[in-house]
UniProtKB/Swiss-Prot annotation:
Keywords: Antibiotic, Antimicrobial, Glycoprotein, Immunity, Innate immunity, Phosphoprotein, Pyrrolidone carboxylic acid, Secreted, Signal. Glycans are attached at T39. It is found in: Secreted. It comes from Drosophila melanogaster (Fruit fly). This is Attacin-C. Hemolymph (at protein level). The modification Pyrrolidone carboxylic acid is found at Q24. Residues 22-23 form a propeptide. Belongs to the attacin/sarcotoxin-2 family.
């Protein structure tokens, strides 16, 4: 375990030096900003080290790029995995924003597990999230997970806030899925969010895919009670590694 932690620390430093090559697109931030959960670490064969990533089109401009280095120890059903990553947008004009870098350490035992993720976006915020996952159903085609999460966040201006909650996540082997999330930000209110995703096309090797996604969220308490936010996106992605 100590070797995995040491590897994470070393690689975070390496990715930090590469961060300037992947500028991130600007975000609109009408409320407290919190990004979607980071992409879960992929599961690899025991003791295999893998460099991978993805490139996804962005209708707002540029492409969203991600680079990650993962190391797993164990079997596909029972393992510990460490990952370091950097993510941003390739667009540099008219405005570019810092690249988000981070590290994840996860444990999985037949679909049940724990995950710790630390992220840093210079000039924007720092976050530390803990997630517990329990697999409720999996028959090889349909999968249903229950998750509980807690995160501690600090914005660049020094403002700190927590975000805690639970979620149900359904996924289909063909790439379709839906997620229902209930979150609480103490002192600000509670939110209910429903997200859906559909795979419209994928290459034979499944490395290139066209996906449609949508989200709808509503504040159920606090000063923003009743306010809703809707979003949708269509993206072409290519995965490597």
């Amino acid at each position: 375990m100590s070797k995995i932690v040491l590897l994470i620390v070393v690689i975070v430093g390496v990715l930090g030096s590469l961060a300037v090559a992947l500028p991130q697109r600007p975000y609109t931030q009408p409320l407290i900003y919190y990004p979607p959960p980071p992409t879960p670490p992929r599961i690899y064969r025991a003791r295999r080290q893998v460099l991978g990533g993805s490139l996804t089109s962005n209708p707002s401009g540029g492409a969203d790029a991600r680079l990650d280095l993962s190391k797993a120890v164990g079997t596909p059903d029972h393992h510990v995995i460490g990952q370091v990553f950097a993510a941003g947008n390739t667009q540099t004009k008219p405005v570019s924003t810092p690249v988000t870098s981070g590290a994840t350490l996860g444990y999985n035992n037949h679909g049940h597990g724990l995950e710790l993720t630390k992220t840093h976006t210079p000039g924007v915020r720092d976050s530390f999230q803990q997630t517990a996952t329990a697999n409720l159903f999996n028959n090889g085609v349909h999968n249903l997970d229950a998750k509980a999460f807690a995160s501690q966040n600090q914005l660049a201006n020094g403002f700190k806030f927590d975000r805690n909650g639970a979620a149900l996540d359904y996924s289909h082997i063909k790439g379709h899925g839906a997620t229902l999330t209930h979150a609480n930000i103490p002192g600000l209110g509670k939110q209910l969010e429903l997200g859906g995703r559909a795979n419209l096309w994928q290459s034979q090797d499944r490395n290139t895919r066209l996906d449609l996604g949508s989200t709808a969220s509503k504040w159920t308490s606090g000063p923003f009670k009743g306010q809703t936010d809707l979003g949708a996106n269509l993206g072409l992605s290519h995965y490597f590694g």
